[in-house]
Amino acid sequence: MEFEKIKVINPVVEMDGDEMTRVIWKFIKDKLIFPFLELDIKYFDLGLPNRDFTDDKVTIETAEATLKYNVAIKCATITPDEARVREFGLKKMWRSPNGTIRNILNGTVFREPIICRNIPRLVPGWTKPICIGRHAFGDQYRATDLIVNEPGKLKLVFEPSGSSQKTEFEVFNFTGGGVALAMYNTDESIRAFAESSMYTAYQKKWPLYLSTKNTILKIYDGRFKDIFQEVYEANWRSKYEAAGIWYEHRLIDDMVAYAMKSEGGYVWACKNYDGDVQSDFLAQGYGSLGMMTSVLVCPDGKTIEAEAAHGTVTRHYRVHQKGGETSTNSIASIFAWSRGLAHRAKLDSNAALLSYTEKLEAACMGTVESGKMTKDLALLIHGAKVRRDQYVNTEEFIDAVAWELKRRLLGNNSRL
């Protein structure tokens, strides 16, 4: 039966990627997107060969297009190391495209698990998702560190641009070897982090928690706490109270303990390092990185970039290159499309598109809950003795989702 395609009013930016995720990306478009939607895609190839060919200019162009059109949907990409430089014959070791895009958009990355009833969780009490936001700027990730090989004084010096007066602190008097580190953050970046976090929690109608260690880092982490409170009081308190949700600051150790015993259903705003660590902890606790969404949200809440939380699945791609069968989990990549298109639908007030995205996500979960799943999920249920008849291959899973999506659309759409 022919479908009357849903018209997507405004464009979306598509960022193609690398390896096995590039393979499943095409399956997703051909089987789950194009048969149902009439949409204008602004396509950018962020595959590593094209980034190298364009001297990485394509990454910057992609970010600029995202700011123009407000919605981007990204396939997983390779961040090259020395081995990849040799493998692809690259001109240089290009930076992470995610980092470049994130810096241009000034956004916060929010990761959220996809929960299926029949997939066991290492933390069984997590019956609702925990959405974790990582402030991916500054701190240890832009720090300057050094090895000290001899006795001497370590000092921290600040020289104001418009003054000759220095502020100088003696950090430590070394009597022997050691290590040292200096790191920073900016009010502008922390404020953007606060706005993105407040917006995301409000959209979900979930409470928001910020975790820091301000009892130890009284000034540094205290600045995060103070700015979040300022933003909340100025822009969000009345909205949160009307929605029956709240914002609260917690110590990181208290927050980790709370997370372990909670049922989920909240947004957790983390500083850079905490978010790096805790997002993988949450992914494993819920079952799999293959079942994690990742959305970069800008401070105004208008511009987002959606992607899968995992990498390019190199090991499966090597099998695919040799003509072997793979069973690669495409759910997080499908959800990149659904979350991006859902945001497009909200910006455009497109009820038909929003309904389609909800049915697409429900089709994914319904397919898994009916017993059709890829090997990684079957292993979580059946363990190492999983049999071949207990999972489907890469394309079979997407075909099963497409069938389930059609069934759901037919049941509720009189145009079909």
Curated annotation (Swiss-Prot):
**A GO molecular-function annotation:** magnesium ion binding
**What subcellular compartments does it reside in?**
Peroxisome
Q: Which SUPFAM superfamilies match?
A: Isocitrate/Isopropylmalate dehydrogenase-like
Task: Please give the positions of the paired cysteines in each disulfide bond.
Answer: none
Q: Which Enzyme Commission number(s) are listed?
A: 1.1.1.42
Q: Which reaction does it catalyse?
A: D-threo-isocitrate + NADP(+) = 2-oxoglutarate + CO2 + NADPH
Q: What is the official name of this protein in its record?
A: Peroxisomal isocitrate dehydrogenase [NADP]
Q: Which organism is it from?
A: Arabidopsis thaliana
